[in-house]
Amino acid sequence: MQVNDLGFVASILFVLVPTVFLLILYIQTASRQGGKDS
C-alpha cells in the first residue's frame, strides 16, 4: 500500500508540476503579446 501511495503521489507531482510551469509560461507569453491585437 505504501509503495502504491508513494507512486500515486509521485505520478501526480510528475505530471502536475510541469503542467503548472507550462501554464505559467503560456499565460505570461499571452499577456505579453497583448489581447487588444486579436
Swiss-Prot record:
Location of the protein in the cell: Cellular thylakoid membrane
InterPro entries: PSII_PsbM, PSII_PsbM_sf
Membrane topology value: Single-pass membrane protein
TM segment ranges: 7-27
GO terms under biological process: photosynthesis, light reaction
Pfam families assigned to the protein according to its UniProt record, in alphabetical order: PsbM
One Gene Ontology CC term in the entry: plasma membrane-derived thylakoid membrane
Taxonomic superkingdom: Bacteria
Keyword Disulfide bond: no
Keywords: Membrane, Photosynthesis, Photosystem II, Reaction center, Thylakoid, Transmembrane, Transmembrane helix
Keyword Cell inner membrane: no
Role according to the record: One of the components of the core complex of photosystem II (PSII). PSII is a light-driven water:plastoquinone oxidoreductase that uses light energy to abstract electrons from H(2)O, generating O(2) and a proton gradient subsequently used for ATP formation. It consists of a core antenna complex that captures photons, and an electron transfer chain that converts photonic excitation into a charge separation. This subunit is found at the monomer-monomer interface.
Protein family according to the UniProt entry: Belongs to the PsbM family.
Subunit record text: PSII is composed of 1 copy each of membrane proteins PsbA, PsbB, PsbC, PsbD, PsbE, PsbF, PsbH, PsbI, PsbJ, PsbK, PsbL, PsbM, PsbT, PsbX, PsbY, PsbZ, Psb30/Ycf12, peripheral proteins PsbO, CyanoQ (PsbQ), PsbU, PsbV and a large number of cofactors. It forms dimeric complexes.
HAMAP family tied to this protein: PSII_PsbM (MF_00438)
Protein name: Photosystem II reaction center protein M
Origin species: Nostoc punctiforme (strain ATCC 29133 / PCC 73102)
